């Protein structure tokens, strides 16, 4: 929040890592809330806002996209899809993004005055090393019953299971 409040001009870069993350909308919420603050402070016109999303679309639920695009337009945010943050040089203030649609393409490097980076997320280590997980490290449950696929006396729920839902409490 201090970075947002203190930024009066320059470039603000926001990134969204590949799924799963606990809340697919959180990286965008950070951008919209920051932009709204800058808009109300009268400095948004002096800030270049860029959003880099590893995914190919703004949001996975297409019915929400038109409303979100209104905010993107209001805040004049540049959208960059299929770009994953892979490196940050904090001293030089440069963020590097891989084009996931074309992995052979050179990295896209962009300077920033403020960077909001959401780290990739995974299950806790104590879960990943247990015998309860699938090949990706998530607790392996039947998505309809939440019963473990190998251990009938185990049920699991929450953001450590391999169900395809967003890992969020929202």
What would you call each of these model-derived segments?
Residues 1-8, 111-170:
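FAD-site-proximal beta/loop scaffold in flavoenzymes
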Residues 1-43, 143-144:
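Glycine-rich dinucleotide-binding loop and its adjacent helix/turn
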Residues 11, 46-49, 153:
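Residues at the starts of beta-strands that form the adenosine-phosphate
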Residues 17, 54-56, 159:
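Cofactor-binding loop segments of dinucleotide-utilizing enzymes, especially the Rossmann-like FAD-
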Residues 22-26, 60, 164-165:
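Secondary-structure boundary/capping motif
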Residues 27-31, 65, 170:
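Amphipathic alpha-helical segments in well-structured domains
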Residues 39-141:
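A Rossmann-like FAD-binding core segment of flavoenzymes
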């Amino acid at each position: 929040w201090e970075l947002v409040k203190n930024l009066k001009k320059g470039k603000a870069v926001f990134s969204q890592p590949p799924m799963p993350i606990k809340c697919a909308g959180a990286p965008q919420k950070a951008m919209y809330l920051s932009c709204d603050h800058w808009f109300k402070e009268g400095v948004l016109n002096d800030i270049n806002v860029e959003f880099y999303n590893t995914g190919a679309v703004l949001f996975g639920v297409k019915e929400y996209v038109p409303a979100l695009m209104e905010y993107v337009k209001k805040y004049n945010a540049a959208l960059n899809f299929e770009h994953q943050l892979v490196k940050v040089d904090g001293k030089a203030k440069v963020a590097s993004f891989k084009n996931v649609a074309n992995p052979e393409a050179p990295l896209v490097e962009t300077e920033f005055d403020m960077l909001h980076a959401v780290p990739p997320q995974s299950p806790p280590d104590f879960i990943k090393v247990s015998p309860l997980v699938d090949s990706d490290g998530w607790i392996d449950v039947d998505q309809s019953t939440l019963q473990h696929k190998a251990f009938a006396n185990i049920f699991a729920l929450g953001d450590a299971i391999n169900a395809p839902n967003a890992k969020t409490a929202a």
